[in-house]
A protein has these predicted regions:
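Hydrophobic single-pass membrane-insertion segments
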Residues: 18-29
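Active-site cofactor/substrate anionic-group-binding motifs, chiefly glycine-
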Residues: 115, 122, 127-132, 136
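Core hydrophobic alpha-helical membrane-spanning segments
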Residues: 6-19
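Aromatic (tryptophan-biased) beta-strands that constitute blades/sheets of beta-rich domains
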Residues: 32-96, 131-146, 182-191, 234-242, ...
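Repeat-blade elements of multi-bladed beta-propeller folds
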Residues: 62-66, 101-121, 146-172, 198-222, ...
């Protein structure tokens, strides 16, 4: 039996079982806005588009949300089956020091597991032992919890070319060094901080860009997805999912067309909804992004 594999799982206390090990640096926490420093040549978290496309060639890793660009969430590993599942046991567990929900999908890269806990905190741990290699706390203001529909959760990170990307509950996108947890840059993704936007979804990375949406359609916001340059944090484009005030210039021909189908009432005063709170999938064959939107607002009666 290949002893490199057990299985993965993260519960409320952070239970996990898995793979290989690797040495990385210590925790460093900084703050700033993009760009804040020139990053050294990365040695950890060396994921690129080619590795994610060929994810089946390294089944012992879980390189992206959903495992691959298709987000199939299926492991091709065969060691755990009907005959062997009864032999599984707990390899290690980790108390994450919170009584709030954990909803992150761990990303596993060459023996290091990257995941988030409540309040958008990020951890890198040795996947074999559970030892914390570094952690990062974005220090989300506690009052932001009032905007979170479904607890102060976070669904995980993206790892790409030596960096770890996380969206914070209060609407920031942050890039960290995958080896040390040092902050490289952060940007404010929110178009209006007086509106109850949140981020609980995991970023997606592809083709040199980081893609992030947001939540809050229940409370009256307007949904959109933004692409940022993965290296610098500079905004590349933004796409709104619902039309805004028809008395103002439209952001795109698509929004002008969509506005013709929105009838009755002044929906733009309550945002319009349509937030992309987690469903973002990249198709490398066509270089297209597919997104799923949440409820409209005001809610239909």
């Amino acid at each position: 039996m290949n002893k490199g594999l057990l299985v993965i799982g993260i519960a409320v206390i952070g239970a996990a079982i898995y793979f290989l090990s690797n040495d990385v640096g210590q925790s460093l926490e900084t703050s700033g806005s993009a760009p804040v420093m020139a990053a050294p040549e990365p040695t950890v978290g060396l994921i690129d588009d080619a590795r994610i496309i060929a994810a089946d060639d390294e089944p012992g890793n879980w390189l992206s949300f959903g495992r691959n660009y298709g987000e199939t969430r299926f492991s091709p590993l065969t060691q755990i089956n009907r005959e062997t599942v009864s032999e599984l046991g707990l390899a290690w567990f980790k108390d994450m020091g919170t009584n709030r929900a954990l909803e992150a999908t761990p990303i596993v890269v060459d023996g290091i597991m990257f995941f988030t806990t409540s309040w958008s905190r990020v951890y890198a741990v040795d996947a074999r032992t559970g030892e914390t290699l570094w952690s990062y706390d974005p220090k989300v203001p506690g009052e932001w919890a009032r905007w979170a529909c479904c607890d102060v959760v976070n669904r995980g990170v993206a790892v790409y070319k030596g960096r770890v990307y996380v969206g914070s509950l209060d609407g920031r996108l942050i890039a960290l060094d995958a080896g040390t947890g040092t902050e490289i840059w952060q940007v404010d993704t929110l178009v209006d901080r007086d509106r109850p936007y949140t981020i609980t979804g995991a970023p997606r990375v592809a083709n040199g860009k980081v893609y992030i949406g947001n939540g809050g359609a229940e409370y009256g916001v307007r949904g959109y997805v933004t692409a940022y340059d993965a290296a610098s944090g500079e905004q590349v484009w933004r796409f709104y999912t619902v039309p805004g005030d028809p008395n103002l210039p439209f952001e795109s021909p698509e929004m002008e067309m969509a506005a013709k189908t929105w009838k009755g009432g002044e929906w733009w005063k309550v945002g319009g909804g349509g937030t992309v709170w987690n469903s973002i999938v990249y198709d490398p064959d066509f270089n297209q992004l597919y997104i799923g939107v949440g409820n409209g607002s005001p809610w239909t009666r």
